[in-house]
Every structure is written in C-alpha cells, then in structure tokens.
Design a protein with these regions (language model features):
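Short alpha-helical donor nucleotide-sugar binding micro-motif in glycosyltransferases
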Residues: 47-48, 55-60, 144
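Nucleotide-activated donor-binding/catalytic signature segment of Leloir-type glycosyltransferases, i.e.
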Residues: 30-51
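A charged, aromatic-enriched C-terminal amphipathic alpha-helix characteristic of glycosyltransferases
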Residues: 122-152
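Aromatic "clamp/platform" in nucleotide-sugar-dependent glycosyltransferases that forms part
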Residues: 68
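A conserved mid-protein helix/loop that constitutes part of the nucleotide-sugar donor-binding site
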Residues: 1-9, 31
Length: 152
C-alpha cells in the first residue's frame, strides 16, 4: 500500500506502476490493496514467470521492494540480474544484499520512498538490452568447430 500511495502522490502521467505477484489467499488486506491499486490505475499482473516476467523486467524503469518482512529476496536478486535500478526497504534481508546506500529507504517511510521514486524517474532511462547475436546456434556451432580445429 505504501508503494501505491507513494507512486500516486507523484502524479506521473507518463509512467505506470506494475505490481507482479499475488497472495496465496485472499484476506481483508489483499482486498484493500487491490481496491487501492484499481483506484490509482495500478496494473496488477498476478503471478508471472518465464517470458512474461522477462518482458516485464526488460521494459521496467526500476524495481521496488518495499517489504516490511522478507526472507531471501529472490525477486530483488532477479531484478538485479537484469541490471535494473532498485529501491528497497532497509529490512535486514535486503541489507544483506549489500546495495549502495541510496538504494534503501526507511521501512514504512512513504515520503522517503516517494523521493527515491521521483529521483529515479527524472534520470535518463537506459533500457536493458541483451545482445543475443552471440548466442545463436550457428555461431555457437562455429565456435565449437573452431575449438576442435585448434586442437589438432
């Protein structure tokens, strides 16, 4: 809820907030969260993986993990593997990752989260590009043949 409110306070017309994932069971909090998201034009994807998750992460402006409780933050590590800028709460599990100080915000501090979001949105955007030419099968086969030729 803090992320939705912080993003909504920015009144950014050119950006969308996308929340990926869902809860295992529907409770009052998750119902309120979904209602708040709908009121503020937030996109809720539900659980996603594979190609859809890859598309989301390659087109993301940044990754935010505002958790107040978290084990090993796999989603954070995954976002970092895409070289995304990250904004995370300063809970112990996130601190263990060892990010730069300015990636963290005080857990529960919506104003600080809002400031971090604003700072991210004014920076130049560099989309993530993967140079897949190096990984096509023809090129790999040529490299393998080259290795064998050099052996003899």
């Amino acid at each position: 809820h803090q992320l939705i409110r912080a993003f909504a306070a920015l009144k950014q017309q050119n950006y969308k907030l996308v929340l990926a994932g869902d809860t295992d069971f529907e409770d009052d909090y998750s119902k309120k969260l979904k209602s708040l998201a709908k009121e503020n034009g937030v996109i809720l994807t539900g659980f996603i993986k594979g190609t859809k998750l890859h598309e989301l992460l390659t087109h993301a402006r940044c990754f935010v993990l505002p958790s107040s409780h978290e084990g090993l933050p796999i989603a954070l590590l995954e976002a970092m593997s895409y070289d995304l800028p990250v904004i995370v709460s300063n809970i112990p599990a996130n601190l263990e990752v060892g990010l730069a100080f300015d990636c963290y915000f005080q857990t529960g501090n919506e104003k600080q989260l809002q400031e971090k979001l604003q700072k991210n949105l004014v920076q130049d955007f560099c989309s993530v590009h993967y140079f897949m030419d190096e990984y096509n099968w023809d090129r790999i086969a040529e490299q393998v043949v080259s290795v064998y030729r050099n052996m003899f």
